[in-house]
Amino acid sequence: MLFRSPIVRFFSRILNRITITVVLVALQLLWLCWVAFAITTGTGRVWVNGLLNALSLLIVLYLVRKDENSAYKVGWIALIGILPLLGGALYLAFGNKRPSRRLRSKMQAVEQAHRTDRAQQPGQTAGLCDENRGVSRYLTQYGCYPAWQNTTARYFSCGEAMYPALLADLEKAEKSIFLEFFIVSQGKMWQGVEDILRRKAAQGVDVRLIYDDFGSLLGLPKDFVVRMERAHIRCIPFNPVVPLLSLVMNHRDHRKIVVIDGKVAYTGGINLADEYINAITRFGYWKDAGLRIEGAAAWNFTVMFLDFWNAFRPFEQGYSAFRPQLAVLPASDGVVQPYADSPLDEEPVAETVYLDILAQAQQYVYFYTPYLAIGEEMLDALR
């Protein structure tokens, strides 16, 4: 084993990628503040101050008229009120929630090319009551994902309950394994998954991984992508973190998806990190929920993953190769409709679904979330 002195270990710890990024971004912010101060206090400052104030006023008027979450608008308006000279410029730099024009163009092209893969099959919603059928139509129209019968769902109340089932399903993979996560971090949980992925890739299974670069920044080595590609695991780090101020640096991929052979899918709030299975302790007991879907509705997750994958890699000629022929369909007494929200429009699909659930509730509604940050509309509905 290579011995490293305490000094070497110290500098290795402080000179990691995230520390360097934070320091460089902070220096850029300080430089911009100095430039702004120099401009607004030097020759021509009256004109510059007037232009910046006018910009801030226009941004406030735009936010007031914008169809947007009220808490989000109030936050920005308050910031602009506190910093009238810089508030408008800060909104232009960091307030845009839509993806870059290039990524938006690619995502739109992918969605158009594979729209038929989201077509609603006839008869799938026949057993729904009128209220639920309305929600289903809304999800089909705005979420662009169909509803399915012949699907079973299993709920896991915590990560350590879901983990063994996930490993067992990964071991059964014969054709494809698709994974998409916000956090992937080296440790017991990831090692168990990685061992299976490497073995399956060596057997010829199509294994692909998308992970958020910021969410996984502290948990993965620098050469992670190279190591995965060498093992024939195709890999995409979403929105790589760079030590430069960027208009899209806060655009992150928080989805947690696993799709196995197009037959079984996992989703929920559980990332691939040890705290999610309580193998380590961070902030006490870590409780996130998971969901296992088996049957026809797993197809929606396949389309979600491939749509996003194709925005960064060359188009798949068709998704039909990943659509399983289910000889025996699981029996079920309900309808399952997995859906994804889109950054390409202003429609708050997920929030609208929750509001509709609350509006229809007659006796009780159970919500579970480890993070509670809701806007006024949701608070009003809960009251």
Question: What positions do the PLM features span?
Answer:
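Active-site metal-binding loops of divalent metal-dependent hydrolases
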Residues: 270, 370-371
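Helical hairpin unit composed of two closely spaced alpha helices linked by a short loop
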Residues: 371-383
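N-terminal localization/anchoring segments of enzymes in phospholipid and broader phosphate metabolism
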Residues: 1-356, 360
